[in-house]
């Protein structure tokens, strides 16, 4: 059956005429506007279907879809009652419930969400470079304390067929990754990074394209899931890519929000859809913006999803091998301010001398220029992403330099404990309580 969204800017007989033309309409939600209508009771009688109305149109939409079997919602409203932001917010609610949303010249259709036969956790982001892979690695390392997690990724440089990396067994060295790159694969793909930083089994998949809601045009995640179901492991972590995430009906969701993002990408468009899914929300890079912006982001999130637990975090670089006493260059995707903070942290915490820095890990030509300028170093510290292997690692090994990969560890700056929050999710997924 269908539901229609109506307003008081249309005469009731016009609305009734449109409802009749649509057909199979079980109910309507009144969005606002009073210019051309009388009271709600007479409007309901005129349109001939049950009418939901009240102060909050979002609450009324939720109530209507809970009380009726709705497969499609038709928007018969218009400006000034609804603006673009309103419509995106309505779409977010409807798509979360698997309901198509259609207007005069637009249509948002839900993607079929597949089920998985193991407890599952999706980690998605509100954009690229928000630290989603770092959070996934942290979550996997944490869940290892109580379970055997498997990570399924969906990178834009992933393999054509699902690829299993036994991070719990395989020694992932710079030489190994260079050989992978020379074989034609993207050796800095997310499943390699996760395997290196968390030491769990990962399954690399590929995807192409990303829609407005967050689903890919093509991907092979379903094949990866089938492998995960057969492997030893009791929790499957489904890791998104950029603002895209797997079309899987997960048991739990963690949404990663970058504090440096534009506010409208969080509160508008399909930011509310991603936030609305979350059981746990991790705001990353919270040390890179003002207190006022953090407070604004928190208020937006709380207005969209008041039940989600929110954690404010900053990333601290964590070398995966000993670096004490070394003269190193630091290569990252971080912006200049973040790169400087990372360098200071490494020098103060690990007693290493940073003699050169590059923020151009995601820009191959500029990275090559940067590397050609550096002198008097013995070690390259680099994140495993972007051009880390085919440029940074290959160049370092060519000149006899040591390569040490670094992880970005999320650290709470709000006196909360992200590790405990992740463990709580893990216990719930296992059907147990700590």
UniProtKB/Swiss-Prot annotation:
It catalyses: (2R)-2,3-bisphosphoglycerate + ATP + H(+) = cyclic (2R)-2,3-bisphosphoglycerate + ADP + phosphate. GO terms for molecular function: ATP binding; cyclic 2,3-diphosphoglycerate synthetase activity; ligase activity. InterPro entries: cDPG_synthetase-like (IPR053199), Cyc_diphosphoglycerate_synth (IPR016557), P-loop_NTPase (IPR027417). GO terms for biological process: gluconeogenesis. SUPFAM superfamilies: P-loop containing nucleoside triphosphate hydrolases. Its EC number is 6.5.1.9. It comes from the Archaea. The keyword Nucleus does not apply. It is an enzyme of class 6 (ligase). Keywords: ATP-binding, Cytoplasm, Ligase, Nucleotide-binding. It is found in: Cytoplasm. GO terms for cellular component: cytoplasm. Belongs to the cyclic 2,3-diphosphoglycerate synthetase family. Catalyzes the formation of cyclic 2,3-diphosphoglycerate (cDPG) by formation of an intramolecular phosphoanhydride bond at the expense of ATP. PANTHER family: SLL0572 PROTEIN. This is Cyclic 2,3-diphosphoglycerate synthetase. The lineage of its organism: Archaea, Methanobacteriati, Methanobacteriota, Thermococci, Thermococcales.
């Amino acid at each position: 059956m269908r539901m229609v969204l109506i307003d008081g800017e249309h005469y009731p007989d016009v609305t009734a005429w449109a409802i009749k033309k649509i057909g199979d309409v079980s109910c309507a939600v009144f969005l606002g506007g009073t210019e051309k209508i009388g009271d709600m009771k007479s409007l309901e009688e005129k349109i001939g279907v049950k009418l939901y109305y009240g102060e909050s149109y979002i609450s009324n939409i939720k109530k209507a879809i809970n009380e009726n079997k709705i497969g499609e919602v038709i928007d018969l409203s218009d400006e000034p009652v609804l603006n673009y932001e309103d419509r995106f917010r309505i779409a977010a609610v409807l798509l979360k419930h698997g309901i198509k949303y259609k207007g005069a010249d637009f249509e948002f259709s839900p993607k079929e969400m597949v089920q998985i036969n193991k407890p599952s956790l999706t980690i998605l982001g509100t954009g690229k470079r928000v630290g989603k892979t770092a959070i996934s690695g942290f979550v996997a390392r944490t869940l290892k304390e109580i379970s055997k997690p498997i990570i399924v990724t969906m990178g834009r440089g992933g393999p054509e067929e699902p690829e299993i990396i036994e991070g719990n067994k395989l020694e992932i060295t710079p030489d190994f990754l260079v050989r992978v790159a020379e074989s034609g694969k993207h050796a800095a793909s997310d499943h390699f990074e996760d395997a290196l930083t968390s030491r769990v089994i990962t399954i690399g998949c590929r995807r192409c394209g990303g829609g407005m809601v967050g689903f890919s045009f093509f991907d092979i995640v379903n094949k990866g899931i089938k492998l995960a179901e057969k492997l030893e492991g009791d929790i499957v972590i489904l890791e998104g890519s950029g603002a895209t995430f797997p079309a899987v009906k997960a048991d739990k969701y963690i949404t990663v929000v970058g504090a440096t993002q534009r506010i409208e990408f969080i509160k508008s468009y399909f930011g509310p859809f991603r936030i609305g899914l979350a059981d746990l929300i991790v705001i990353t890079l919270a040390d890179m913006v003002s207190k006022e912006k953090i407070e604004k982001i928190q208020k937006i999130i709380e207005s969209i999803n008041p039940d989600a637990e929110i954690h404010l975090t900053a990333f601290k670089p964590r070398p995966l091998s000993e670096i004490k006493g070394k003269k190193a260059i630091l290569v990252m995707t971080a912006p200049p301010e973040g790169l400087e903070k990372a360098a200071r942290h490494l020098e103060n915490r690990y007693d290493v001398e940073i003699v050169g820095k590059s923020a151009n890990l995601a820009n191959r030509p500029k990275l090559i220029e940067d590397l050609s300028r550096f002198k008097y170093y013995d070690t390259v510290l680099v994140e495993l992403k972007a051009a880390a292997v085919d440029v940074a690692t290959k160049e370092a090994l060519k000149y006899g330099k040591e390569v040490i990969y670094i992880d970005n560890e999320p650290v709470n700056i709000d006196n909360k404990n992200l590790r405990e929050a992740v463990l709580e999710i893990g216990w719930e997924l296992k059907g147990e309580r700590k």
